[in-house]
């Protein structure tokens, strides 16, 4: 844990947060930040051993952490995630929808229909269905944070269709902000490039990594701590008058539609 993480506040004491796909990478970074700020965090991923390992890492930090196996495309597992959270904590204050896949580097018109379906199902549809399950238990003043991507603003060749699904989350954020107001705020973050397992096919290439760094104003890649801080801000009462917005967290990389 770096020095910045020792100076954080306690904005989520008494709050309950669900974060999907949160046993590593950006999802884990968000769970860690929310937990360090006092939230009871419910983490999830597809594999039990990953869930168990991540829960233990959070508990070592003094965080109240609970883990549930959940593949977000599985309706029963989504429902179980919500049901177990409510059974244990009685409410939901924050939902962070982070699960995503990028199974192809093909051009959009060369992408198989089954892959198109998978991208839509995991990256967009599952977020909607998760909120349908969670919404009856969301508290007054609750918050939803979608994890979009810098690719939403300019899909690149190696991740074109992935970028399109992340663009869809920008619209979903706007639409649900209206639909769920005033009880629940809905926002998103659009991370830049972060060296995680999900992005290692890009960030592990030194030439590509350097080129990405040079596209940022800050001349560096992002970190999971950066993403955790941004998501925590939007989920907190510090952002009480912000809804329907997507915060770009990309070191100044060009990012507007």
What function would you assign to each model-found segment?
Residues 131, 165, 173:
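Active-site helix of classical SDR
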Residues 16, 23-25:
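Conserved glycine-rich cofactor-binding loop
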Residues 79, 102-117, 158-161, 200-204:
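Conserved mid-core segment of classical short-chain dehydrogenase/reductases
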């Amino acid at each position: 844990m770096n020095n910045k993480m020792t100076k954080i506040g306690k904005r989520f004491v008494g709050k309950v947060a669900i974060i999907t796909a949160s046993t590593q990478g950006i999802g884990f970074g968000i769970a860690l930040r929310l937990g360090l700020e006092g939230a009871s965090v419910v983490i999830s991923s597809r594999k039990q051993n990953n869930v168990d390992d991540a829960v233990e890492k959070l508990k070592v930090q003094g965080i109240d952490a609970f883990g549930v196996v959940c593949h977000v495309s599985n309706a029963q597992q989504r429902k179980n995630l919500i049901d177990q959270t409510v059974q244990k904590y009685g409410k939901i204050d924050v939902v962070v929808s982070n699960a995503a896949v990028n199974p192809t580097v093909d051009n959009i018109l060369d992408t198989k229909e089954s892959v198109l379906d998978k991208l839509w199902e995991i990256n967009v549809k599952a977020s909607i269905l998760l909120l349908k399950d969670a919404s009856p238990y969301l508290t007054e003043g609750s918050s939803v944070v979608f994890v979009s991507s810098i690719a939403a603003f300019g899909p690149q060749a190696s991740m074109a269709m992935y970028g399109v699904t992340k663009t869809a989350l920008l619209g979903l954020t706007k639409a649900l902000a209206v639909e769920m107001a005033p009880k629940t705020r809905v926002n998103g973050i659009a991370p830049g490039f972060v060296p995680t397992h999900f992005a290692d096919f890009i960030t592990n290439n030194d030439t590509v990594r350097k080129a990405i760094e040079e596209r940022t104003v800050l001349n560096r890649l992002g970190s999971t701590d950066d993403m955790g801080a941004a998501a925590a801000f939007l989920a907190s009462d510090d952002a009480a008058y912000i809804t329907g917005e997507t915060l770009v967290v990309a070191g100044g990389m060009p990012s507007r539609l």
